[in-house]
Amino acid sequence: RMQKLQTAREEIPKEDQYTLYRDGEVLVLGFGSVKGTLLEALDHLEGVGYLHLRLLWPFPEIAPLLEGKTLVTVEHNYSGQLADLVQQETLKRVHHRVVKYNGRPITLDEAVAALKAVKEGRAPKRLVLRKGV
């Protein structure tokens, strides 16, 4: 199983493993279905970047992109599994976990409000989105 991961890392081009859509002092990391909402949210935010992961193990390649940033993960799960993986594999601290686990998609309003709160220093370390409950 681990050999498959190594083979994927070697054979999948870097541009197909992750995409940095915009850099910023606040860097959001996401995976899967959060992409569309987060890309749209960037239009409403300054100083916020987005790194979209398409392969769950683009490590250690992304580590330099995380240097000196306020790191935020946005996820559709309870515990913030992507944040755990990023921290484990890059040794970089994820400062904020934005999570939603009620089965509803993250809305543009929720994403913008959460990321503004992070940028302004008002966000808790774990922010649970609840719209649509």
Functional labels for PLM-detected ranges:
Residues 1, 5-16, 47, 51-60:
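Catalytic-core signal marking the mid-to-C-terminal active-site face
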Residues 3-10, 43-47, 91-92, 116-124:
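Generic secondary-structure signature for well-ordered alpha-helical cores
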Residues 6-27, 39:
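Glycine-/acidic-rich phosphate or pyrophosphate-binding loops and their flanking alpha/beta elements
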Residues 18-23, 63-66, 88:
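Solvent-exposed alpha-helices and their adjacent loops that cap or buttress functional pockets
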Residues 22-25, 46-48, 67-69:
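Short coil/turn connectors at secondary-structure junctions
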Residues 27-29, 72:
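Conserved beta-strand elements of the Class I
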Residues 33-65:
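Generic long, charged, amphipathic alpha-helical segments
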Residues 71-133:
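Peripheral docking tails and interdomain loops at the edges
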